[in-house]
Swiss-Prot record:
Protein name: Sulfate adenylyltransferase subunit 1
EC number: 2.7.7.4
GO biological process: hydrogen sulfide biosynthetic process; sulfate assimilation
Subunit structure: Heterodimer composed of CysD, the smaller subunit, and CysN.
HAMAP family: Sulf_adenylyltr_sub1 (MF_00062)
Spans annotated as G4: 165-168
Length: 469
């Protein structure tokens, strides 16, 4: 049995207790096709002894059929789970894997390198604390490297590790690593990525500088990849100042209890704090902070809690509870960045459901400011947005919502776009700011026309009738 299987088999309770309080780091791997992303994750899983023996046996068997390495087994097959991925030797879907060390827990998202799977990479990056961008030492910074760096910046990932892989194929030459480092840092500066970028020379296939320092690169004085992942500071990434609490569920098991359930998006709340409910603007104070393990005196970002208040206020799912002295901005017209994920193009004026945290409303694109070519990063005019394209646009909502910019608060500043007919998620967006023009145009329609329009939109949504004012 493997070390992991032995621990679980002998004392599962102590194993779970040992790991439950460790800090969690979510990270993604991205880079050009065949840069070794899946192999790197396989190496991390293998060297951290997080593979069951039956998994290892299956991988060894599959390696003989579809393996791409000359070794005993292909580490990439630990991650490439889809049959089409194994046959093509590429990653298509976002593959999530979990492992743990003595210091920290990890969730890895292995994202596709191909341009046609940009939406998949955006999905994997949306919850990541850190991104590992792989560069093949033989080829240096490539078009896909630039694309993935742009997406990590777009999605607000604060910590970047550039892993220069396959250094064994260039004999771990220091000058090659230094040249790639210089090229990438120059590009990152042009992109506005100036904080927390670390470069590491590695060989994912052989394990050099992954968990143990390699003797082949005595000139490299920095941390190994694993040591960096275990020690990088992510606590300060959380906003513990501005309290935001999207109400997910109103819990009323009996006449004597009415609690508001959800997960704190940011900030800290204490019993007795003055709060305001948005969009109604009604105020109260916190009576109790209830959890499964008992009541708390205070709670903070990412904790799931139930709040009770000292006053009877009408609150429902989708409302936002904030501290009265720390209120967010509010608007119905927003400047947003959109990643389009549907084969049906995004058209100006077409109405979609817009879901931000627990708030759901209806909205449409008023106009596109520009779209960005993810390969050249050039901006151009746009009338529609096609699959995998990214655009800055003006989003018009049917109701005013409270929001923070995505850069300040990912939960309050992100949303998904849902097709009103199929209920498919067709896009994702990041709120950058409120639009300069918040006024509604003077109506050119009669009261009857406006009421009839509302009736048609309510009972015949498949007609995709646009709202008039």
């Amino acid at each position: 049995m493997s070390d992991l299987e032995n621990k679980i088999a002998t004392d599962i309770e102590s194993y779970l207790k040992e790991h439950e309080n460790k800090q969690l780091l979510r990270f993604i791997t991205c880079g050009s096709v065949d840069d070794g992303k899946s192999t790197l994750i396989g190496r991390l899983l293998h060297d951290s002894k997080m593979i069951f023996e039956d998994q290892l046996a299956a991988i060894k068997k599959d390696s003989k059929k579809v393996g791409t390495t000359e070794g005993e087994f292909d580490l990439a097959l630990l991650v490439d789970g889809l049959q089409s991925e194994r046959e093509q030797g590429i990653t298509i879907d976002v593959a999530y894997r979990y492992f743990t060390t003595d210091k920290r827990k990890f969730i890895i998202a292995d994202t596709p390198g191909h341009e046609q799977y940009t939406r998949n990479m955006a999905t994997g990056a949306s919850t990541a604390d850190l991104a590992i961008i792989l560069i093949d030492a033989r080829y240096g910074v490539q078009t896909q490297t630039r694309r993935h760096s742009f997406i990590t910046k777009l999605l607000g990932i604060k910590h970047i590790v550039v892993a220069v892989n396959k250094m064994d194929l260039v004999d771990f030459k220091e000058d090659i690593f230094n040249q790639i480092s210089s090229d990438y840092l120059k590009f990152a500066q042009e992109l506005g990525m100036t904080k927390d970028i670390t470069l590491i020379p590695i060989s994912a296939l052989n394990g050099d500088n992954i968990v143990k320092r390699s003797e082949k690169s005595p000139w490299y004085k920095g941390d190994t990849l694993m040591n960096l992942l275990e020690t990088i500071k992510i606590d300060e990434d959380r906003d513990l100042v501005h309290f935001r609490f999207p109400v997910q569920y109103v819990n009323r098991p009996n006449l004597n209890f009415r609690g508001f359930c959800g997960t704190i998006a940011s900030g800290v709340i204490k019993v007795g704090d003055a709060i305001t409910v948005l969009p109604s603007g009604k105020s109260s104070t916190v009576k109790e902070i209830v959890t499964y393990d008992g009541n708390l005196d205070y709670a903070y970002s990412q904790q799931a809690i139930t709040l009770t208040l000292n006053d009877e206020i009408d609150i429902s799912r989708g409302d936002i509870i904030v501290k009265s002295d720390e209120q967010p901005d509010h608007a119905s017209n927003l400047d947003v960045d959109i990643v389009w994920m549907s084969e049906e193009p995004l058209i100006k004026g077409k109405q979609y459901f817009i879901k931000r945290a627990t708030t759901v409303t209806v909205g449409s694109i008023d106009h596109f400011y520009y779209k960005t070519d993810v390969n050249t990063l050039e901006q151009s005019e746009a009338n529609v947005l096609n699959l995998n394209e990214i655009s800055r646009a003006k989003l018009d909502l049917e109701q005013v919502i409270a929001f923070d910019s995505y850069d300040k608060n990912k939960v309050m500043g992100s949303f998904i776009i849902i097709d009103r007919i199929t209920n498919n998620t067709v896009g994702a967006g990041m709120i950058r700011n409120k639009s300069e023009d918040q006024s509604k145009k003077d109506s050119i329609y009669s009261d009857f026309e406006i009421e009839f329009n509302a009736l048609v939109r309510k009972h015949f949504p498949h007609w995709e009738c646009k709202e008039i004012f």
